[in-house]
Amino acid sequence: MTNIRKTHPLMKIVNNAFIDLPAPSNISSWWNFGSLLGICLILQILTGLFLAMHYTSDTMTAFSSVTHICRDVNYGWIIRYMHANGASMFFICLFLHVGRGLYYGSYTFLETWNIGVILLFATMATAFMGYVLPWGQMSFWGATVITNLLSAIPYIGTNLVEWIWGGFSVDKATLTRFFAFHFILPFIIAALAMVHLLFLHETGSNNPTGISSDADKIPFHPYYTIKDILGALLLILALMLLVLFAPDLLGDPDNYTPANPLNTPPHIKPEWYFLFAYAILRSIPNKLGGVLALVLSILILVLMPLLHTSKQRSMMFRPISQCVFWILVADLLTLTWIGGQPVEHPYIIIGQLASIMYFLLILVVMPTASTIENNLLKW
């Protein structure tokens, strides 16, 4: 009798994706983050669902409904903080996942990579809209500042902003639609993630060497299922340490003050995972220029396959490119720090230098380093 998992139409899909999938024998822990992102997404959808049962998307009651969740709903506080800090864990995994792709040349899987970039944009949009929902000071002013950036678009800008707001300022209509979008987007992300996997399984996984591993494959189960479970346990441990011991560590104290359109907070800044992009935005004195730089800072990932000049796929055996990569990581950390600082000397100039360096490293230094390595190896 043939096995049901190999014959049943639904089980066959699961089997080919998670059980009998041929996987390279040498993929390291950097390959764990895909499954961790899946776990983060499921966790966010579940906690978000329970939060939505008690949340009201009205400007008069939104803030107090979140307070009610934390005070009166059974285990509401843990659901709320798991959702808020779950977003941080989500972005940590996302950044490491993208970094892994850059380091090991996974961007040569074009469809998988491009859908990944779309996923990154969708996740950033979801997180931004979710941050607006508690309707604290930083929620309101963050929404005002970021949506206002669209007014920099020539000719249609002002109309576009008012269309998104549903009025002449961030108000009830804005909050309601942000809640609607925040609810639907994670399901779109889940669908996109399945397409992401579909394209990945067309080619098979990359591995640290960047060399074809067709000659040496092992079944995904039990080898990588057990490895993913270990990763998941560590992820949940990190998340619960954050939730139970320092739930407000990554948040902004201003968001515990109800939104007040008449009182601007001294320093408007987004959540930590957007600070690098926010620093790039602020480092350009022109509004439209800043918005373009902001979008390009993420969209530049699409160009990675075109900028790949090396004869080798991975950076594993390319010391010069490795140095450039880690300088880029340091630059992004610098930008993250600058994004959280006030707009004054010396932070302005540091931010501008770090922003220039970010684009230079990706567009000029990395391809040059690759070409130098090719020449050194007489290729």
UniProtKB/Swiss-Prot annotation:
Binding annotation for heme b b562: H83, H182
Q: Which GO terms describe its biological process?
A: mitochondrial electron transport, ubiquinol to cytochrome c
Principal place of residence: mitochondrion
Report the superkingdom from the record. Answer: Eukaryota
Annotated residues that bind heme b b566 are located at H97, H196
**Transmembrane feature ranges:** 33-53, 77-98, 113-133, 178-198, 226-246, 288-308, 320-340, 347-367
PANTHER family assigned: CYTOCHROME B
Similarity comment text for this entry: Belongs to the cytochrome b family.
An additional note in the Swiss-Prot or TrEMBL entry is: Heme 1 (or BL or b562) is low-potential and absorbs at about 562 nm, and heme 2 (or BH or b566) is high-potential and absorbs at about 566 nm.
Protein name (Swiss-Prot/TrEMBL):
Cytochrome b
Which taxonomic lineage is given here?
A: Eukaryota, Metazoa, Chordata, Craniata, Vertebrata
